Amino acid sequence: MPRYKLTIEYDGGPFCGWQYQDNGPSVQGALEAAVKAICGDAVRVHGAGRTDAGVHALAQVAHCDIAKHFAPNRLRDGLNAHLRPHPIGVLTAEIVPDTFEARFSALRRHYVYRIANRRANLAIDVGHVWRVPRPLDTLAMHAAAQRLIGKHDFTTFRDTECQAKSPEKTLDQLDVVRNGDTVTIVTSARSFLHSQVRSMVGSLVWVGHGRWSADDLSNALAERRREACGPVAPPDGLYLVRVDY
């Protein structure tokens, strides 16, 4: 039975997240329905990142085992045909060894968070960036962000419903870059806790507004209490952009 690796992009706005939820449609569910329409069997599609409701992906990775053999390009095209009502695109399909696991074989996950730092309302990017009207000091944000690099207990920056066994994660990158009125936060790690990226982004925005200093961010991390976190950024601006293997 061949195992297929899929690289997928999607607009997370209409979905309750990657994973099955009782409260609405999921990306996983839409993909599995498309696979079933092609091969006739119920097949589980496993994703590398369980993105939350409203979070987007430019290159989510998934794998599935299909009893019938398909040429990878034919599988890709067939899935896209059945996914057409949804804002989901299968970019590539390839046959991989059966030892490959989209989630557990991943070496690093890369996310980008986009902020529109402007007074004007959004006309084009509604649902795809976080509009922050007050000016942000991105140099202060970037400097403070470096306090979070490395291995830490990120209890402060994880959702209270996070199911990870340990709150310890190693953060490899957290950069804040401005290009005009667009502020981009780039982060990478082998894995992240539930809501960790959005929690870090919201706290960095407090730094950008001058409400917190870099020391305040460090102190919040050290407290290891969810209540010590700043605001949680909305999902609109968050994108899973790459998974390394």
From Swiss-Prot:
Catalytic activities: uridine(38/39/40) in tRNA = pseudouridine(38/39/40) in tRNA
Record carries keyword Isomerase: yes
SUPFAM superfamilies: Pseudouridine synthase
EC number per UniProt: 5.4.99.12
Record-linked InterPro entries: PsdUridine_synth_cat_dom_sf, PsdUridine_synth_TruA, PsdUridine_synth_TruA_a/b_dom, PsdUridine_synth_TruA_C, TruA/RsuA/RluB/E/F_N
Single GO BP term: tRNA pseudouridine synthesis
Gene Ontology molecular function terms on file: RNA binding; tRNA pseudouridine(38-40) synthase activity
Keywords: Isomerase, tRNA processing
Residues that hold substrate according to the record: 111
Entry annotation: catalytic residues: 52 (nucleophile)
Domain of life: Bacteria
A family per Pfam: PseudoU_synth_1
Gene3D superfamilies: Pseudouridine synthase I, catalytic domain, C-terminal subdomain (3.30.70.660), Pseudouridine synthase I, catalytic domain, N-terminal subdomain (3.30.70.580)
Keyword tRNA processing: yes
Subunit structure: Homodimer.
Function statement: Formation of pseudouridine at positions 38, 39 and 40 in the anticodon stem and loop of transfer RNAs.
Family, as annotated: Belongs to the tRNA pseudouridine synthase TruA family.
Designated name of the protein: tRNA pseudouridine synthase A
Record organism: Nitrobacter hamburgensis (strain DSM 10229 / NCIMB 13809 / X14)
Gene: truA
